[in-house]
Amino acid sequence: MISGATPMRVAILGATGAVGQTFIRLLAGHPWFRVAEVAASERSAGKRYADATRWIEGDLPADVAGLTGTTCDPRAVSSPIVFSALDSEVAGEVEGTFAAAGRLVLSNAKNYRMEPDVPLVIPEVNAAHLALLDTQRARRGWAGGIVTNAN
């Protein structure tokens, strides 16, 4: 990222859970990314993030506290990059719909981790594996893509 550039808008799926809160804490003040959207269950949709979550990660970042939560639906989320903290029971289907809708999904779930066309990336070790995204997009017909971590 170029120094002085505007941080990219990102969304957090599963934002009210412990992993979602960790993503928010780690991204607070990040020079490349700005948490612009928080998404979780239907129960949290329409509520201010501060009211929808029981924050456990220290101080809730003020710029996220006032965000209005949405559902985990690509029609409700406009950010081009999505950090997914969804439980594996729902992550596979939801993350796939976001990738098909043109979003880059950075997933913490196991669902796509062993797929041969999905990069499992440890940035300090194998960032070059991101090149698999081209294969993934061609094979799956997605405009976006999914990248997993080793968790």
Region annotations inferred by a language model:
Residues 1-151:
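N-terminal Rossmann-like NAD(P) cofactor-binding subdomain of oxidoreductases
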